[in-house]
Swiss-Prot record:
One of its GO terms (molecular function) is structural constituent of ribosome. One of its GO terms (biological process) is translation. This is Large ribosomal subunit protein uL4. Keywords: Ribonucleoprotein, Ribosomal protein, RNA-binding, rRNA-binding. Belongs to the universal ribosomal protein uL4 family. The keyword rRNA-binding applies. Residues 64-76 have a biased composition (Basic residues). One of the primary rRNA binding proteins, this protein initially binds near the 5'-end of the 23S rRNA. It is important during the early stages of 50S assembly. It makes multiple contacts with different domains of the 23S rRNA in the assembled 50S subunit and ribosome. Forms part of the polypeptide exit tunnel. InterPro entries: Ribosomal_uL4, Ribosomal_uL4-like, Ribosomal_uL4_dom_sf. It comes from Bartonella tribocorum (strain CIP 105476 / IBS 506). Residues 42-94 are annotated as: Disordered.
Length: 206
């Protein structure tokens, strides 16, 4: 299948042949959900922790004698039912990350690309580069291409002027091809790929 290549000015600059195994798959929401959940779980810090009964600073002495008081039996004042005691089954410092097979991750990326193309939310440009780092000029380019909320994926290296100009625009993310991921693709309305990015994806999934 062929994709139309556009310039930043919105003009056509030819066509690019792409593989149907990357850009024309049947949508699978279950796979996309698994990959997004895996990404967000890896990102979650997990630094929350409460003090258990072994962590609180209270005496370890028995509260009162075992028998003869008529009261319920108690030992440590650190028990969760007492004021100043430890938290029962509270959160602990841990990693929320879980495993996901590489094949599922790769399939998820191809499904995300296919979903954007089927929704007509995929734009291919010849290159992501500008002469001057002028945000106002770049905004006009984006309006000509028809988007104001997008993820832009360049080649191995991002043009520094383009990156600086785009960094001031809200709802616009710019990443090199190494950083492409399912979550960022789905969270933005449009996906903009440079010609170099498409070629890198073709090489990656060959």
């Amino acid at each position: 299948m062929d994709l139309v290549i556009k310039t930043l000015d919105g003009h056509e600059a030819g066509k690019l042949k792409v593989s149907e195994s990357i850009f024309d798959l049947v949508p699978r929401e279950d796979i996309l959900q698994r990959v997004v959940r895996w990404q967000l779980a890896r990102r979650q810090q997990g630094t929350h922790q409460s003090q258990g009964r072994s962590d609180v600073s209270r005496t370890g002495a028995k509260m009162f004698k075992q028998k003869g008081t008529g009261r319920a039996r108690h030992s440590s004042a650190r028990a969760p039912q007492f004021r100043g005691g430890g938290k029962a089954h509270g959160p602990v410092f841990r990693s929320h990350a879980h495993d996901l097979p590489k094949k599922i991750r790769a399939l998820g990326l191809r499904l995300a690309l296919s979903a954007k193309l089927k929704a007509k939310d995929l734009i291919v440009v010849d290159e992501l580069a500008v002469k001057d780092a002028k945000t106002k000029k770049l905004v006009s380019h984006f309006s000509k291409l028809g988007f104001n909320n997008a993820l832009l994926i360049g080649g191995q290296e991002i043009d520094i002027n383009f990156f600086r100009a785009a960094s001031n625009i809200p709802n616009i993310d710019v990443l090199p091809i190494q950083g492409i991921n399912v979550y960022d693709i789905l969270r933005r309305s449009k996906l903009v790929l440079s010609k170099a990015a498409v070629e890198a994806l073709e090489e990656r999934f060959r």
